[in-house]
């Protein structure tokens, strides 16, 4: 089966695991998924990332992070720019998610960065998703 939107697949797997409070999510690896997972790790939404090869395709194993009593750390994920409707922003238009409580993940000419890093670098780009 051909996957038309691997970023939406990543977000959906994380969202579904979060809802049922699974400890680990496994998915096929790619550069963009790895970069997004690293951002989620740096921002404190994931506990750990592991890359392994199952013999057929490289895989990512994401360890979910929960608070006390399995309280969810990730309360929401939303795909913004989709294959059918790309959403771009200039450096002046970089969105703030929940007035700074969440993050926007943006694909720029310097790679995939958070909204805060994009503002610091003075770069715009494609708004991939919001996480809060």
Curated annotation (Swiss-Prot):
InterPro entries: Ribosomal_uS8, Ribosomal_uS8_CS, Ribosomal_uS8_sf
Described function: One of the primary rRNA binding proteins, it binds directly to 16S rRNA central domain where it helps coordinate assembly of the platform of the 30S subunit.
Superkingdom of the source species: Bacteria
GO BP, one annotated term: translation
GO cellular component terms given for this protein: ribonucleoprotein complex; ribosome
Quaternary structure and interacting proteins, as annotated: Part of the 30S ribosomal subunit. Contacts proteins S5 and S12.
Alphabetical list of SUPFAM superfamilies matching this protein: Ribosomal protein S8
Alphabetized UniProt keyword annotations: Ribonucleoprotein, Ribosomal protein, RNA-binding, rRNA-binding
Gene3D superfamilies attached to this UniProt entry: 3.30.1370.30, 3.30.1490.10
Protein name, UniProt field: Small ribosomal subunit protein uS8
UniProt-recorded Gene Ontology molecular function terms: rRNA binding; structural constituent of ribosome
Family statement: Belongs to the universal ribosomal protein uS8 family.
Gene that specifies this protein: rpsH
Organism: Clostridium acetobutylicum (strain ATCC 824 / DSM 792 / JCM 1419 / IAM 19013 / LMG 5710 / NBRC 13948 / NRRL B-527 / VKM B-1787 / 2291 / W)
Keyword RNA-binding: yes
